[in-house]
Amino acid sequence: ISEIVIENKNYRNDRINYLISKFELDNLKNIKAKFLSGGQKKKLVIALSLLSEPKVLLLDECFAALDVLTIKMLQEIIVNLQNENKITICICDHQARDLLACVDIAMILSNGNIIAEDTPSNLVKDINAKNAYFGDNFKFN
């Protein structure tokens, strides 16, 4: 896949090594993907999606089935990608607390309609978001 995405072999190898390091996969680079844990596979898939340096990245349920340390690492990577690489990242996830910790703007969908859209700190106060998703006892930060 990498040969199709990046023709220049030196640049391709540099990019692969950078992503392996960024996602802390150094000790796994000689292991076949089928032997990786779920969290390791998820990190690998996201790293592969960044190989071509996209301007927009779509992540679906990226926090699902991950341990707390991997979630924290992924949140930091998402924030860094947004800030350093100026990449737009759209995330769809049911783990609101994990999602809100690393985004600038969030939306709540209900029955296919956007019912609330705001910064995370404002969104958790929104009455529509509370009624449809958060409830009264949700605490953020």
Predicted regions and their residues:
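Hydrophobic anchor residue at the start of the ABC signature
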Residues: I46-A47
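Conserved ABC ATPase "signature" region
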Residues: N10-L28
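Helical segment within the ABC ATPase nucleotide-binding domain
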Residues: K72-E84
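Conserved ABC ATPase signature
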Residues: K32-L36
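Conserved catalytic motifs of ABC-family nucleotide-binding domains
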Residues: E53
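Walker B catalytic motif
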Residues: E61-C62
